Amino acid sequence: MDKLTIQASKPLTGSVVISGAKNAALPILMAGVLAETDFVLSNVPELRDVSTSCKLLRCLGAEVDELGGGRIRISTTNLNEFCAPYDLVKTMRASILILGPLLARFGTADVSLPGGCAIGARPVNLHLHGLEQMGAKIEVKEGYIKARVDGRLKGAHIFMDMISVGATENLLMAAALADGITIIENAAQEPEVTDLAHCLIAMGAKITGVGTATLKIEGVERLQGCEYRVMPDRIETGTFLVAAAVTRGRIRCENADPASMEAVLAKLEDAGATVTSGEDWIELDMHGKQPKAVNIKTAPYPAFPTDMQAQFCVLNALAQGTGRVTETIFENRFMHVPELIRMGANMELEGHTCIIQGIDKLNGAQVMATDLRASASLVIAGLMAEGTTLVDRIYHLDRGYEHIESKFQGLGAEVIRVK
């Protein structure tokens, strides 16, 4: 099993090209099922979850051609299977996003209950309840969600009991082919949801309220394929910016989307960074200074993203002063904390809050990645640890970061993949 070895780094310097957003690419790949003609995506990252999504689409009978250079073509002309099996779904929660498209276009879907990162329950009941409101008959049996509808799904007025990115995406895709108007209230406003909506509109969907908490979808009878470019990955961007801040460096992120990162950029400025940006780039400069501790509280977009929480725990661990990091989205999302404590971090958990007293250096150690973003935080920690840090179980990293070691190497870090 692959591991990463990391040596203490000089300040990171240089430029890094940001990949397409995993959390936008996965639902957009599933949206390909809705299209009656060929669908071509670009800026798709080379990731394990993307590969799993392509396998799932092929398993259903779709033709999926990886054209190179981050381009994928999908044809559903011969799609004739409607079951997403456990073997594929168990490794990736986003597999649940095939449910809405299959049901909306073909009237039937059997989807195994999902797996993915072990960061809490993340129930699928919001997905199912919304689809039932649109006329679907659903039962959960022997580990599978079995959904059927006679004819087309029907437009409905859906109020989400809690904000859910995945449920918003599933219902948005289903509503695009429903009969009548669907209104989704308390919808997730994440940029990746907006990216999916823009893709659906390019396919012929009628959606208003994009980027707000109320989405209105006027269902159409059919959708066509299109060419669409996936948005840049704001979490990958934030990860590299935090790494630069922790190492007191100066970097430039190309192919970035500053507009989707206001909460993160504001906290980096609070930490003492000079942040400048253009339409598709962001520069961060620490001027050689140690960052200052910041207080973080995760919440749905446009507030601070839960997917950047672990990285900012490391920033606070190596900052001047004391910072508090409060997690409100997922339970059990501080699994990186015991590993960071093993590296010498001064951290204490009080319920959903981690209180962190900053120090100058950590100590290299063998640590274990427990989920995707925790993995990234351990890599950043290794850049400011004396000696060698060995990060085990990096298959989590490969689910969400494209060529992470080579990108860090391009910024001057000693991050090496070993068997």
From Swiss-Prot:
EC number: 2.5.1.7
Domain of life of the native organism: Bacteria
InterPro entries linked: Enolpyruvate_Tfrase_dom (IPR001986), Enolpyruvate_Tfrase_sf (IPR036968), MurA_subfamily (IPR050068), RNA3'P_cycl/enolpyr_Trfase_a/b (IPR013792), UDP_GlcNAc_COvinyl_MurA (IPR005750)
Any single GO BP term: UDP-N-acetylgalactosamine biosynthetic process
Pfam families noted in UniProt: EPSP_synthase
Modified residues (2-(S-cysteinyl)pyruvic acid O-phosphothioketal): 117
Disulphide-bonded residues: none
Pathway terms, separated by semicolons: Cell wall biogenesis; peptidoglycan biosynthesis
Record-linked PANTHER family: UDP-N-ACETYLGLUCOSAMINE 1-CARBOXYVINYLTRANSFERASE
NCBIfam families: murA, PRK09369.1
Protein name: UDP-N-acetylglucosamine 1-carboxyvinyltransferase
